[in-house]
Amino acid sequence: MAKPQVVHQPPQGVALSDLLTIKGREAAHRWLCDELGLPLRLNYVRAAVAKGEMPSVKKGEVHYFSTRGLFQWALKFSEVVL
């Protein structure tokens, strides 16, 4: 018997966007902690970006993130942690 597909929704009041509205790894870390309540260290986010595990676009020396990409990454992260 197949498992039913679970649709994950962001927390109340958190809007997701495909636009690259978050500038920098520190801002991505802050969004993940403040908006989603994830217990992450900044170095974990930096390592995930460096390994290409966290979706981002690099322009010059700065990484840009979308809230939808961060939310989808957080779902994968929470499966590993929980």
Q: Each predicted region: which residue ranges?
A:
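Polyanion-binding surface elements
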Residues: 7-42, 76
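Intrinsically disordered, low-complexity regions enriched in Ser/Pro/Gly/Gln/His and often acidic
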Residues: 24, 64-66
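Generic N-terminal leader/processing signal
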Residues: 1, 21-23, 57
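A short, Lys/Arg-enriched interface patch at domain edges and termini
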Residues: 68-82
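Major-groove DNA-recognition helix of helix-turn-helix-type DNA-binding domains
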Residues: 33-64
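Generic structural signal for individual residues within well-ordered alpha-helical segments
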Residues: 29, 46, 71-72
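Arg/Lys-rich, low-complexity, intrinsically disordered N-terminal tails that contact nucleic acids
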Residues: 2-9, 80
